[in-house]
Amino acid sequence: GVRYSEAGEALEKFCAEFNIPFAETQSGKTACLSSDKYNLGGLGVTGNSAGNVMAKDADVVIGIGTRFSDFTTASKSLFKDDVKMVTINTSRFDAYKLDAVKMVADAKLGILALGDELRKANYKSAYTTEIADAKADWDKEMEILANYNYDENFKPLIAARDEKTIPEYVEKIGGVITQTAALAMIRKLIPADALCTGAAGSLP
């Protein structure tokens, strides 16, 4: 919804003004700068630790233009039991999900309207170092993953697995670079203004 509404800049300004972190769904990628101070990255089973840790501890979650899919919400297990949900969505059906306080509206207009109300209430979140800490922890993890290769020191991240799978995979591809290391390398090497198109038949 943020991408279709071209509301990326409005969302970034909203989050900066009220000290609110945000995470992205796969469909929402490119709507906001990944380098934005408040952008935690992905969310849910296809997300990262920064987005998921902050979402798990949140008292209020604002879903903007999202369908709250199982990937995004970790099959509805990501949030606290008593979390308060707020939705902004042009689809009334999706706005009503998770027993949310709903705003059936365009994402950009909804963000601006919500900002007006928060401004009247002199609202600012109570976060101090939590956002930066979560991002720093993820950066450390990403550095480990970026250097995670099929070498003599390789140890699988998931112990419960078929022991033949990884050796067979390495033999077939004929290389030592893991998917995460390859993606990290691409991210470092591509120009800042590059356009990327991707598709996958399974989890990354």
Regions found by a protein language model. Give the residues of each.
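Short, solvent-exposed amphipathic alpha-helical segments in soluble enzyme
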Residues: 8-19, 76-81, 102, 119
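Phosphate/diphosphate-binding loops
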Residues: 44-96
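Short gly/pro/ser/thr-enriched loop/turn and capping motifs at secondary-structure boundaries
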Residues: 28-33, 69-70, 92-96, 111, ...
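Phosphate/pyrophosphate-binding active-site segments
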Residues: 86-197
